[in-house]
Regions:
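Alpha-helical segment proximal to the catalytic Tyr-Lys
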Residues: 24, 68-71
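A short helix-coil junction within the Rossmann-fold of NAD(P)-dependent oxidoreductases
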Residues: 21-30
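Active-site helix of classical SDR
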Residues: 19, 55
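Residue(s) in the substrate-gating loop at a strand-loop-helix junction
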Residues: 39
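C-terminal helical subdomain
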Residues: 75, 79-83, 98-145
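Active-site loop immediately N-terminal to the catalytic Tyr-X3-Lys motif
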Residues: 46-50
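Substrate-binding pocket helix/loop in short-chain dehydrogenase/reductase
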Residues: 3-5
Length: 153
């Protein structure tokens, strides 16, 4: 239960508190771009991922709502939703280093730098352009849930 509560506090409540604290400063600056870090789990679900998927669906809803609320202001809002990325997430989720590494055997997952490049790209767009939702997956991952992955021998 404590892991579930921590996940919801981090992924939903943490996002709400961050937006509440930071939005006045973004407005005061006269321009801004707010990024939400979502997940493909905010678009689909998978077995054993109910709470995580629910939390990422929550992040997606918060991003969409903020985009509506800021319409007409010079502030862009983008949700970046990565698929399989080789980060510590898998180790935390599985609590086993070998199992975590096994998720990526024979495939090339996203790296944190790939996500950073996507964010940089969105930042560099003309001011009047807003990317609402950016789903980012490696070429080897076809489905949001990882149900279809190309693995090399």
């Amino acid at each position: 239960d404590s892991d579930m509560e921590a996940m919801l506090r981090t992924n939903v409540e943490g996002v709400v508190k961050t937006i509440r604290a930071g939005l006045p400063f973004v407005r005061q600056s006269g321009w801004g771009h707010i990024f939400f870090l979502g997940s493909t789990a905010g678009h689909s679900t998978y077995e054993g991922g109910g709470v995580y998927c629910a939390s990422k669906h929550g992040v997606k809803a918060l991003a969409q709502t903020l985009r509506l609320e800021l319409c007409g202001e010079p502030i862009r809002v983008t949700s970046v939703d990565p698929g399989m990325a080789e980060t510590e997430f898998s180790l935390v989720r599985l609590q086993d280093e070998a199992k975590a590494k096994g998720l990526y055997v024979g495939m090339e997952p996203l790296q944190a730098l790939d996500i950073a490049e996507c964010i940089r790209w969105a930042l560099d767009l003309p001011d009047h352009v807003n990317i609402d939702d950016m789903i980012v997956k490696g070429r080897d991952q076809a489905s949001h849930t990882g149900a279809k992955i190309h693995r090399r021998a």
